[in-house]
UniProtKB/Swiss-Prot annotation:
Belongs to the UPF0482 family. Residues 1-32 form the signal peptide. It comes from the Bacteria. The keyword Magnesium does not apply. Residues 47-69 are annotated as: Disordered. It holds the Pfam family DUF1283. NCBIfam families: PRK13659.1. It comes from Yersinia pseudotuberculosis serotype O:3 (strain YPIII). This is UPF0482 protein YPK_1977. Keywords: Signal.
Amino acid sequence: MMKINNLPRLIRAFLPATLLMLPLVWQTPALAQSASCTQGSTCVSVGGNNDPMSKEQARQSQQQWDETNRLRNKMNNRVEKDFDKNDRAVDAKDNCERSDNLNAYWEPNTQRCLDRLSGRKINP
């Protein structure tokens, strides 16, 4: 029978060995799972996955992401351009309405400041 005062010494002796073995025990189920990973199932693998099918899927995924990103950038640029256009039109309307020129009026369809007498564009 083991004495109780030897228990802390045994714990100090086996604890480092147990901690070193824990990662090996942790990895064993992961290695077993990777062997049974099939097409269409959700599997996560770390390391060298060099089969051509996964490379093709990664390439297609990257290509789709690039196209989506390009379209998103085009849409953002268009929205920004429209916003800037409307912002300039509001500023031009304010300038036209505050103009000292009594013949200046704002044409909402063309978003320009025009002369009442000639119909030509003016810069107030």
